[in-house]
From Swiss-Prot:
Name of the molecule in the record: Toxin Td4
UniProt domain comment: Has the structural arrangement of an alpha-helix connected to antiparallel beta-sheets by disulfide bonds (CS-alpha/beta).
Signal peptide from the UniProt entry: 1-7
Organism (species): Tityus discrepans
Residue positions where Arginine amide is found in the record: R71
Residues covered by the LCN-type CS-alpha/beta domain: 8-70
Stated family: Belongs to the long (4 C-C) scorpion toxin superfamily. Sodium channel inhibitor family. Beta subfamily.
Matches recorded under PROSITE patterns: LCN_CSAB
Places the protein is found: Secreted
Length: 73
């Protein structure tokens, strides 16, 4: 019996709709944050935002089409 697990890659977003900033964070910050949401791994992309791999589909990720960062709630 096989099991299909849906997962995705992407930028983590906070409640404000903005990407998780990692500019002034320690090197392990993004990997830890990605792990916290059950992602496989993560890194600080260009020292600006956390990018995660193999996260469950329920995790909110940044999308240009639905970006609401800086636009209020």
């Amino acid at each position: 019996i096989g099991m299909v697990v849906e997962c995705k890659d992407g930028y983590l977003v906070g409640n404000d709709g903005c990407k998780y900033s990692c500019f002034t964070r320690p090197g392990t910050y993004c990997a830890n944050e990605c792990s916290r949401v059950k992602g496989k791994d993560g890194y600080c992309y260009a020292w600006m935002a956390c990018y995660c791999y193999s996260m469950p589909n329920w995790v909110k990720t940044w999308d240009r089409a639905t970006n609401r960062c800086g636009r209020g709630k």
